[in-house]
Amino acid sequence: MSRSRINGNFIDKTFSIVANILLRIIPTTSGEKEAFTYYRDGMSAQSEGNYAEALQNYYEATRLEIDPYDRSYILYNIGLIHTSNGEHTKALEYYSRALERNPFLPQAFNNMAVICHYRGEQAIRQGDSEIAEAWSDQAAEYWKQAIALTPGNYIEAHNWLKITGRFE
């Protein structure tokens, strides 16, 4: 049984109903429909904190999805799960892969910046100021890209860039 049929959340049910209607009326291939079904089930599992199940669905969706834009969101969600699991190297990889397909994902740039900033803070605690500076510089570059895509968002990042002298 499709995960969307067993989910008790009203919003998820509403989304599933609308998605099913769209799948019926929009001309798409069976592969695209199947990819979307896996993506939808992945989002449902992810929203419930069932990350292993979500990853299985997302991996299957990436195997089937041919549209780069749609793949970017699947890859982004895989990155979110790896971030939640503390697997930062994998998360950075998936955010990068998402951005290769869709360079207009400010949230991916932001999440990459947050990971780099965190690693910089870790390096400071370990007494390695050179590594900390490199991670902070990388965080700054990612935040600049996120801010450039969505001016007015990421106010805290914007302030951090100013305070640290990294805003140009």
Swiss-Prot record:
Pfam families: TPR_1 (PF00515). It comes from Buxus microphylla. SMART domains: TPR. It is found in: Plastid, Chloroplast thylakoid membrane. It is a peripheral membrane protein. TPR repeats lie at residues 35-68, 72-105, 120-153. Keywords: Chloroplast, Membrane, Photosynthesis, Plastid, Repeat, Thylakoid, TPR repeat. This is Photosystem I assembly protein Ycf3. Its main location: plastid.
